[in-house]
Every structure is written in structure tokens, then in C-alpha cells.
Amino acid sequence: MTSIVIIFIVAITLVWGVQIYNKLVHDRNTSLAAWSDIDVQLKRRHDLIPKLIDAVKQYASYESSLLESVTSLRSQAKAIEKISERENVERELQTQVHKLIAVAEDYPELKANQNFLELQKDISNVENDIQYARRYYNGAVRNINTRIDSFPDLVIARFLNYKYHEYFQLDD
């Protein structure tokens, strides 16, 4: 009788551990997939930047320091893997791209250029997509981090050495 009780307790504990493990794996994979979505949107923005620079160069040759800054930040952002470091570079890149678009106010020909207007619209759409992807990612990170912190999941998470995931913050 006692051996049946022990087997039952071990079986219940094992099933419980497997369920928690599967939930942790699911949440981790959701977080990784959500980061991939952000990365795709950031790459879309990076792909638009050279076109924007070319459009601005044609009309605003006096803005060379801003153009160089945007080009440099784009290269840096593409090379960084760590989320917190990339977040800082992407935030600065976002600011510089907005400054570059604002330059159009000083150049009426640029402001009226159809190609520039289309790029401006595309960048705005990508910025919106980045924000949507960022919100989804941060929600997924919140879920996995909450699971890592919550009992009884934290027992399995700590045993398996699960680490907190980093949030990704950009200016809205």
C-alpha cells in the first residue's frame, strides 16, 4: 500500500514538473519568436535608410554630418546582438532618422519629391510595425519572467537555470 502511494506521489510530481517545464519552454520560445519579429522590422527600417539618405543627399548636401551619423548608427545596430546595447543604438538611430526626415522642412524641393514622400510613409509604417512587435515581445518577456518568479514554476526554472529575458524599449 505504501509503495503504491509513493509511486503515485512520484508520478504526480513528475507530471507536475513536465507540465511546468513545457510551459517554460513555450514561453521562452514565444519570447524568442517575438524578438525575431522585432528584428525583422528593424531590418526593414535599416533597408529603407540608404534610400532615405540618397533622397536627402540629392537636395540637402549641407547635412553631411547628419547623414554620416545615420549611416554609422545603422552599421552599429546591425552588428549588435545584445538587446540592451542594441536598444540604445536603435533609439539613437530612430532619433537621427526623425531628424533626417525633419530636414525636408528646410528643402521645399525635397519635401515635394514623390520618392521622398513615399519613403517617409514607408518609414512611418515600419516604425508602427516596430512598436507593435515591441509590445508583443515585451508581453512575452513579461510572461516568461513572471513564470520564472512565480511559485511553483520558479523551482523548475531555477533548477534548469532559466534567465530573465530583457525588455526592449524604444520611444513611441
Identify the residue ranges that each predicted region occupies.
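A helix-centric hydrophobic-segment signal that preferentially recognizes long
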Residues: M1-D172
